[in-house]
Amino acid sequence: PPASLVLLILLGGLSVSAAGCIANDLWDRRFDREVARTRERPLAQGMIPLQATFVALVLLLLLSLLVVLALPDRHRLTCLGLALLALPPILLYPSAKRWFAYPQMVLALCWGFAVLIPWAATGAPLVGSITLVGCWLATLLWTFGFDTVYAMADRTDDARLGLRSSALSLGPHCVIAVRCCYALAALSLAFAAWGAGLAAGFWLCWFVAAIGMERSTKGLRSTQPQPMAIYGTHFRHQVWLGSLL
């Protein structure tokens, strides 16, 4: 794709991600005060006025809409439809921990649109592509896996506050579930790369990333509390591995 399209996709992805983070902190500001990992967040501390936060959220959503409207004419309507479908789960995800045992599934669905919208923007069909299906599944599985690890950091506080998460729901099977997600994500990416006919250079990166994903779970414990830094390090490893791919 042309560089201009790549830049638009990056801008749209960053603006939507930022909007989702703001929505999350708005929903959870009262709970965040009671959770060790999040109690220092600006909204939890009351350091930012709510009005300013809502203004920032609206501006970021408008920027995201402008990005969609700036996409190529032939594919704009499809991308707009996908963006509108993505909006409800993005805004509702923070509430999912109140009513759904696996809120990380909702987050995974949100990130799945980060595959579908750029794909549609290039004019590629949304049906019948092994590469698209592989990338989409890998994104869902990887997101569910790493956000489950993130939720492991909050298990004690979440249980006390009556909140739900996949880390709590999976209990002693938590780490094995994360490993399975990572293995299936790597396999899905392999199918996607095979369908796209990628060169040997990618497969070297894929191998390093696949091994790295599994190795990053070695120090995790399904039920025993661990230092917060362990979960943060795991999350940063996923960022680097994703960048490699």
Specify the residue positions occupied by each region the protein language model found:
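Interhelical loop and helix-boundary elements at the membrane-water interface
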Residues: 26, 30-56, 90-110, 155-180, ...
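Multi-pass membrane catalytic core of lipid/isoprenoid biosynthesis enzymes
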Residues: 3-13, 29-83, 160-199
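Active-site alpha-helical segments that house and flank conserved acidic catalytic motifs
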Residues: 13-26, 138-152
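Alpha-helical transmembrane segments of multipass membrane proteins
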Residues: 16, 20, 64, 114-115, ...
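Terminal RNA-binding accessory module
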Residues: 204-213
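Residue-level recognition of pore/gate-forming positions within transmembrane alpha-helices
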Residues: 13, 61, 87-90, 111-112, ...
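Alpha-helical transmembrane segments
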Residues: 5-16, 131-142, 198-205
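Intramembrane alpha-helical segments
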Residues: 11-13, 19, 38-134, 217-221
